Amino acid sequence: MSTISRDSCPALRAGVRLQHDRARDQWVLLAPERVVELDDIALVVAQRYDGTQSLAQIAQTLAAEFDADASEIETDVIELTTTLHQKRLLRL
């Protein structure tokens, strides 16, 4: 499995999609035979997984958007991305 770094440019794997689940009234990552519920923060990050933006770029954008510390945001983004990658929901 690839190592996640600030230069990684993740995207959703084939067959995985970001979708609003009406039954749960929550955003989820929908993959074959599984559903991963996303909280508000995870949703904002997952919406930026397009395969072109690095995690550092995503963190910088979010830091500016939410007036937050970029290094803290980057740590959180890398942690979330690592978790989702380990669940085989992302490609790098």
Swiss-Prot record:
Pathway(s) where this gene product acts: Cofactor biosynthesis; pyrroloquinoline quinone biosynthesis
InterPro entries: PQQD, PqqD_bac, PqqD_sf
Keywords per UniProt: PQQ biosynthesis
GO molecular function terms noted in the UniProt entry: quinone binding
BP GO annotations: pyrroloquinoline quinone biosynthetic process
Keyword Transcription in record: no
Top-rank taxon, per record: Bacteria
Its job: Functions as a PqqA binding protein and presents PqqA to PqqE, in the pyrroloquinoline quinone (PQQ) biosynthetic pathway.
Family (UniProt): Belongs to the PqqD family.
Subunit structure: Monomer. Interacts with PqqE.
Name of the featured protein: PqqA binding protein
Organism: Xanthomonas campestris pv. campestris (strain ATCC 33913 / DSM 3586 / NCPPB 528 / LMG 568 / P 25)
The organism's taxonomic lineage, starting at the top: Bacteria, Pseudomonadati, Pseudomonadota, Gammaproteobacteria, Lysobacterales
Gene that this sequence comes from: pqqD
